[in-house]
Design a protein with these regions (language model features):
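NAD(P)H-binding glycine-rich loop region in Rossmannoid oxidoreductase-like domains
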Residues: 35-92
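Active-site Tyr-X1-5-Lys
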Residues: 135-150
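SDR active-site strand-loop-helix element
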Residues: 6, 30, 65-69, 110-116
């Protein structure tokens, strides 16, 4: 299977990339940083999700896309950073979907992840996909992002 991963330099993306690269998969990484440290055989395509759709070659022949790109959340949340977090989820996803929509052979699967913050801090409560969103900044970002038409 050929899998494209955005956000492969992030906390989840790094681990996912390494796990998939260790299997029998072809991995294409879309990253803002050309110097990203990649496992052998992983193809790198430079893409800034805020500036426009990814390069056509980065998605050519891809069976699945895992979209994890976005402004890092592990930093101090100033008003400016909060706006970057909001914008990076919506704009990056829109640019990716725009590119996918023009392809003659589209990937079978698009998985997007924004933040576990959707559920908020609920202690020992067991959460499922049917659980309501939590409260707070990240929950609000996730809810707004998931409601954006793509």
């Amino acid at each position: 299977m050929t899998i494209a991963i955005t956000g492969a330099s992030g906390f989840i993306g790094r681990r996912l990339m390494k796990a998939l690269a260790g299997g029998n998969h072809n991995i294409k990484v879309l990253s803002r940083h050309a110097g990203t440290n990649l496992p052998p055989g992983v193809q790198l395509y430079v893409w800034d999700a805020m500036k426009g759709p990814p390069p056509e070659l980065s998605l050519e022949g891809v069976d699945a896309v895992v979209h994890l790109a976005g402004e890092p959340i592990a930093q101090r949340w100033s008003d400016e950073v909060k706006q970057k977090i909001r914008n990076s989820r919506a704009t990056g996803t829109r640019h990716l979907v725009q590119a996918l929509s023009t392809m003659s052979r589209r990937p079978s699967v698009l998985v997007c992840g924004s933040a576990i913050g959707y559920y908020g801090s609920r202690g020992d409560e067991v959460l499922t996909e049917q659980s309501a969103p939590g409260s707070g900044f990240m929950a609000d970002v996730c809810v707004a992002w998931s409601r954006k038409p793509i």
